[in-house]
Amino acid sequence: ESPWQGGYLSGIIGKWHRGSHPVNHPLNRGFNEFYGHLGGGHRYFPELLTDRDIFEPMSDYESYFTYIVRDHQTVETDQYLTDEFSDEAVDFLKRNQDKPFFLFLSYNAPHLPLEATEEYLSRFNHIEDPKRRTYAAMVSAVDDGVGELLATLDELGIEDDTIIFFLSDNGGVSKKNASNNKPLRGQKGDIWEGGFRVPMAARWPSAFKAGIVYDLPVISLDIFATIAGLNNAPANQGRPLDGVNLVPFVNGEDTGVPHEAIYLRKYDQQRYAIRYHDYKLVIPKLNAKPQLYELSEDIGETNNIANAHPEKLEQLDKMLKEWTSELQDPAFLGLTHSDAWIKKRNKQK
């Protein structure tokens, strides 16, 4: 909501996954435009879409078959989903080139189900595994789309005034779609490094030198803090941000670390972790004994050193418990409201 309050026209294209209740609709959460789907995944070919009621599905999988939505109205589509979102994003840039804008382009690809057009599949005939081949094709479609966006910004002459962040939302699902997170341990949904540690790229010719590689850990919450910092948005002392403005760190003006500690929680499965500098404490499941790893020497998290460093284990465990004590239970998980939210609502009636 902050960019909207700062005079920006804001739009989201693609996957929303912030709840399907009308109160959680993007247009009720600060966005001016929405084109996409409410659930966490979707079918890629328009002939597979059968449900016009976007609020009827009660599970993420059921929502995969809903029609695409423009603002509040379902629309007929005739393109491969990734190409559809790319074209919409290019159109958004052209329509709003003369005004401040914020665009959240949330590609569904390469999320399951594995579906790609022959145009993209034909680029990877050398890959024998059909899952891996389709996965590569889906990523290639995203690559083409991002290339179109960058070219459009250049053609419109607004590339120097536009900051771009590109990242994934989680690690690959190696057991289902042949993605590969090696040398990291784990996959999507895990609190091992393979579950959440992903690359992030940024482009802003006015400030970032091309080719810079920044190795210290950052988090997706830094994106909001960076945008707020660039807009000189006043800080809300009652609601401090978890993220930081990355510009001085990336440009070398600040030689410290953006985050001394990074905290992780998989609420619905009671998985927790904290990374403090190069040490990482992991609680892989409810009531499990904490494990300790030294990531600079063991990026694959294979050697549990908890018994050898009890003082470090105790320090990180205390920090993690203090952090979790400040958290609220999530209001919804995926498409629908969580049990905790429903119980709280019923008590208030």
Spans of model-derived segments:
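Formylglycine-dependent sulfatase
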Residues: E1-Q291, L295-S325, D329-K349
